[in-house]
Regions:
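A short, amphipathic beta-strand motif
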Residues: 2-11, 21-23, 62, 91
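Short, ordered, surface-exposed loop/turn motifs in non-cytosolic proteins
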Residues: 12-37
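Catalytic cores of extracellular degradative/oxidative enzymes
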Residues: 102-150
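Short strand-edge motifs at loop-to-beta-strand transitions and within beta-strands
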Residues: 51-55, 77, 87-89
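A short, solvent-exposed loop/turn motif at the edges and junctions
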Residues: 52, 66-77
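A short, solvent-exposed beta-strand micro-motif common in secreted/extracellular proteins
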Residues: 21, 45, 59-69, 128
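Short, surface-exposed beta-strand/beta-hairpin micro-motifs centered on an aromatic residue
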Residues: 43-46, 50-57
Length: 150
């Protein structure tokens, strides 16, 4: 196996950027760092990145998708990974709009946690930053007691 080392950088500021990352092997299998916080639930799998990640990757064509909120252009990258060694990736993501400059402030008033999550508090702290939200409200549902809180 080779090691894929990624650094995600804002193209304009040069600063490290927190993002969602999906890594698919040549066989289409989703892989992630061992200690990563993962998306739970339906939809495409991804892990949360603080701007840097390391993953052991099998040889072959590997596809990465990098996303950050609605103001950044998603990046799709294909990498031909060798059988051994280290593949360093500096991934620049570009902001296409600054909504706050136009009087808009992105938010989400209905963020859920999943009762199957192992680290919900960490994920709920990351989610608003990675989605580049200015305001959020977390909804908690005790499924069997039917109590609901925001």
């Amino acid at each position: 196996m080779a090691k894929l080392v990624g650094s995600i950088i804002d193209k304009v500021t040069g600063e490290s950027v927190e993002t969602k990352v999906q890594v698919l092997t040549a066989g289409g299998k989703f892989i992630h760092p061992n200690n990563a916080i993962l998306k739970i639930g339906p939809g495409s799998p991804f892990f949360y990145s603080n701007g840097n990640f390391e993953i052991d990757v099998p040889r072959g064509k590997t596809r990465l998708t990098i996303e950050r909120g609605t103001e950044y252009i998603p990046q799709n990258i294909n990498v031909d990974v060798p059988a051994h060694g280290v593949v360093d990736l500096d991934i620049n993501i570009e902001r296409w709009s600054v909504l706050a400059d136009q009087g808009w402030h992105p938010g989400n008033t209905h963020i859920h946690y999943d009762e199957n999550e192992h680290r919900p508090d960490e994920r709920l702290q990351l989610d608003p930053r990675i989605e580049d939200l200015r305001m959020t409200a977390v909804s908690i549902l005790k499924r069997w007691d039917l109590e609901y809180a925001s």
